[in-house]
Amino acid sequence: MNGSGENVAGCASCAGRCCREYRVAVTVADVRTLAAGTDLHPREFLTLRPVDSTRNGFRTRPRGPAHELNLVRRPANGGCVFLMEIAPGKARCGAYAHRPLVCRSYPTFLRAGAVAVRPDVKCGPGSWSLAAMDLPGYRRDLVHSQAAWTEHWKIVTAWNAALDAAAPDAAPADLYEFLLTGAMPR
């Protein structure tokens, strides 16, 4: 949901279905924003999820399997680590001001350059109306998200190349430190 405050209708009766049913893949920029904004270390909110061998992702072994960065899911409710139950059937993001770009732009995507509502939206029918939404705000967030993912893939490539050149395995803690500082492990 866009942060403008003008688009809360879709989330007003939120039960957190999107935060429970989607895996939330995040960028390096998202990790840094969440860490700085919540004062949490990435090990407290990230998990490395293995991805198909044809996809690019962070590796912890030279030429090893790739992983994407996902927000941790709580075993108790299956939801995102930041999902807060505020009342029965009502949930909100506990890191709202620092939430990932994919969450910020939900439930929209760009179709031929125009903002559109995802066809697989988890909210109830009629929750989102383009006529009532801050379309310039969503467009800005979507364009920003595309740029962040472009930068993310450059960082993934740099990490993997450095790992391949150095030859030792890297622990997840090394990767998390790299995400925060940009410094490769020694």
Where are these regions (language model features)?
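Short loop/turn segments that flank or connect secondary-structure elements
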Residues: M1-R186
